[in-house]
Amino acid sequence: MKPDLFQAPDYYNLDELLTDEHKLVRDSAREWVKREVSPIIEDFAQRAEFPKQIIKGLADIGAFGPYIPEEYGGAGLDQISYGLIMQEIERGDSGVRSTSSVQSSLVMYPIWKFGTEEQRQKYLPKLATGEFMGCFGLTEPDHGSNPSGMTTNFKDMGDHYLLNGAKMWISNAPFADIAIVWAKNEEGRIHGLIVERGMPGFTTPETHNKWSLRASATGELIFDNVKVPKENLMPGKSGLGAPMQCLDSARYGIAWGAIGAAMDCYDTALRYAKERIQFDKPIAGTQLQQKKLAEMITEITKAQLLAWRLGVLRNEGKATTAQISMAKRNNVDMAIHIAREARQMLGGMGITGEYSIMRHMMNLESVITYEGTHDIHLLITGMDITGISAFK
């Protein structure tokens, strides 16, 4: 792969909206990605392998639970800082950002928000350093966009819970030390359980033959009469709203992350267009290529403003689920279109591993699907503005 020469576009001087801390956090993540991710990620994607050696580096830049209070091992940063870290990591690779998103928003977040003090003290510091890695079990083979229909269940056996069922499309599953598992009790109420690797009956087979997120480990969670200690139930919240609150945090991070992928594709296409000579001049001097580049930077700028405003609302505790959903849908859609246009601008070179664009393009096909599909997010917006659910 070619050297990482990335220069971030900032057409509307958005840096002026950021604090010094925001810029320090972002720049640290950006330099780490250039140094540790860019040189190796294409090789790991080609091999369909997650680069475990970067886990410590991810922890060092604050990618694991940056908004978690310092008393639990987090950095105590705000939501804009979290978004900027996700942006920079996804600029490197969506699969690596997925690993970070899951650890932060889908594992550490529910333990912090819904767990007991004992659970927070036991798990959060080790998750923050990457000593423990986690995964999040919600999606099932027959229940994707309809998680309320889940069949994974647990029974009260007196001194423990007995957990049965299966989850699929689970990022980090093959190597996770703990899993946040959402299951129904005997009354049909959804609760979150912390399931540890090594518990008899708990297995995590890996999912192979992916064309997308190849540098991210994906698997299943299988529960065959798993005995879960009662102290591993998170008591702070139950019902579908609990995992949905986690997904709000993850979707927010994705809204920022997608900008990173788009910026990388735009920057690559712009540099290539200035250097590639056809018909005795750079292709950047043609109307068609300028149109593409102008549209790219316009859409990136709009997405940056949307994410920044959403970050302000998150910091103020005012952001709604529907607002987060809109940003996730819009920004991922923006990124996938930019990736496709950038790929065309590079011609045949665009499909090679010398450039990051094709990898981004394939990865974004997953990003536009997970944490709520593209169409489901439209229905969330539709329900919010009309007051009428169209899910059934």
Which residues make up each language-model segment?
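Helix-loop "lid/cap" segments that line or gate small-molecule binding pockets
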Residues: S105-K113
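A short core secondary-structure module
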Residues: D159-H160, N164-T204
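Short Ser/Thr-interspersed hydrophobic loop/turn segments at strand-loop and sheet-helix junctions
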Residues: G62, M86-E90, A183-N185, V195-P200, ...
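Alpha-helical interface subdomain recognition
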Residues: M1-V102, F114-Q119, K126-E131, N146-P147, ...
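Flexible, small-/acidic-enriched active-site or ligand-binding loops
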Residues: G149-M150, G198-P229
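A short, Trp-centered hydrophobic/proline-enriched beta-strand micro-motif
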Residues: G130-L138
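Long, acidic (Asp/Glu-rich), low-complexity accessory segments flanking structured domains
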Residues: D224-A242
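Short Gly/Pro-enriched turn/cap motifs at secondary-structure boundaries
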Residues: L127, D142-S145, W169-N172, K184, ...
